[in-house]
Structures are given as C-alpha cells and as structure tokens.
Amino acid sequence: MPIGKKRTDSHIIGEIGVNILKSKLPVEWVTREYHPDYGIDLSVEIFERKELCVTKGAHLFIQVKTSEEFERFNLRILNRSNVELPPQVVKKAEYCMEVIRYNLDTDFLFTVERMGSGVPVLLCLVEVKTQEVFFVCLSDYIEKILIHDKNYISQKSKTVYVPTENILDENGFEILEWYAKRPRLYALFNKIHYQNNVLQHVDQYELTKYIDHFIRIIRRFDVWEEPLYISYMKQAESEIDYYLEHGITELEDKNIKSKQDSGEDVDSEIWEATYCNPNREVSFREAQKVQGLHRLWTQLSDLGDYFEDMCKEWFLPTALWNMIKDS
C-alpha cells in the first residue's frame, strides 16, 4: 500500500552537513543554496561588519560532502618540478601531510575545470561526529594536481586528498575570503598587463602623464590590504603609495639623494639612459625617474606570474606548499 514520499538518509545527512557548515561561517556572510544542484551546493557572499554589514562583492562556490566520521591518514608527498613548465629534474625531497581522502565523480571535476580557476570552487568535508569542516580549493587542485595525471579524464571518479590542517575556523575565514577575492585579483593583473604594454610605446616626455593616470586606476582596486596577500604585493603597494606622495619611486629617489649627498650633479643633461630619447642626453634625475617608473610596472606585471607559479598551490597537498609554509 502507498506510504508516501520518502526522505533518504543521504538527503538527511547532506542537510546536516550544510547546516554545520553554515553555523561555522561568520553570521554576517550570506549563503545561497542551489535547488536542484548540479555539483555546486551553495554560494557564499562575503560581508564585513562596520556600523552595518556591508558586502565586499566577493563570492565563492562550495561543494559539501558529509560523513559521520572521516578516516585520516598520512600522505607521502614527493617533490616535483613546476607543473606550469615542462618537466624538469628537481632535488629529491619528501613531505608528509595528514589528509582525508574523498572520491569525486570525474564529470563534476570536469565541470569545475570548465569554470576556470578564476571562479574558485571549494570542496568542504563536514564531519558530523566532531562538527569540524575541512576544505580544499578544487579549482587549484585540478589545475596543479589532477590534470597532470594522464588517466584523469578516462576515469569515472578521482580521489581528492584534503589536508586536515585546512580547517574552517577563524583562520580559515581569511583563507576563504582570499579565494573569494580571486576574480578581482585577476582583474588587477589583467589591467596591469594592459598598462605595461601601453607604456612600452610611451616616450619619456609623456610617461609621467600616463603613469599618474594608470597608477590611480590600479590603486583603487580593493585587493591591497588583505592580510593573506603575498609580501611581494605589499612591496608593490608601498611603491605605489610612495610614488603618489613623492612623484618618484622610492629606490630612484634614494639614488638621486645619494648622488646629491656626495656632491654630484644630478640635473645636467649629460647621461644616456634606457627608456629615454636615444638622440639626446638627459639628466641623472630624469633618467632615474623614467627608469624607476618602468621598473615599477615590470614589478607589478610580475605579480600575476608569481600568483600563477606559487600562490595557486597554497593549501594544497603538494611539496611546494609544504616548502612555502615551512619557510
């Protein structure tokens, strides 16, 4: 005889997992569940509390998997060369990380891959027994680990290893926010790349006008003050602010002052310099200013390269991340 619609145990434990995850997040953050979902269970919008809760305009996507208890084991990790470059011989090294393994359908992983690493998708493993949540960025995991397995696409499922040190607590909130702000980081890198190309065709007489315009554009990007960002980026921020205050880059300003302190002439046009008009000589002051601005934009352009090489391996079960966090 009919007994009515049934609710499966998997649906119940899945709902429990989502509720535990929500309870771990800051109360001002907004979560939105997807029904039906096709791999992505919910999205998170980051807010900050001031006098009112204000959105930061940062979002990330989450796939939630729940179990009463996850088995932990120590994963042996071997050193490897940079996966963004052709294989190279590297110094042998070995690391060990405690991880939780979880099998995911390759169809879902391929969907995440198609979304691109500019839209971070996190896998969150919720353990009911301990009420703990562990996470890993699937977008980076696929790019830095999975696609370098020749058999990845041909398999029905793939094992993903989630480091147990990636736990959702107050420190974890900073990491989630770092992932959520990735699209604006990419927007910054793209803008700098465009500006740097333009500057290659600007002569020394127009350079300051272009720089004054460009530098105010990139300084407005809401990416510079985040605590997790690389020290290289903090250095770039400091360089930008020094220029905005003094009208010259810091290193070149020191070079000019050093020459002046030693009694040398910095204003006579007796120098030939890179990036300056090859048909006339310039002053040491002018040469330093022009070269400093090009140096600054080269430094800014390197931010995106560093991010691709290093930062997208943060919090992954890789040798590079172990080297970075232990340094």
Model-derived features: where do they sit?
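A short, surface-exposed helix-loop junction/capping segment
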Residues: 1-6
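Catalytic centers of nucleases
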Residues: 13-82
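Detector for Asparagine
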Residues: 19, 74, 79-82, 103, ...
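A basic- and aromatic-enriched beta-loop-alpha substructure that forms the phosphate/nucleotide-
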Residues: 79-91
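Mixed-charge intrinsically disordered linker/loop segments at interdomain junctions
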Residues: 89-186
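Long, low-complexity, intrinsically disordered terminal regions
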Residues: 177-327
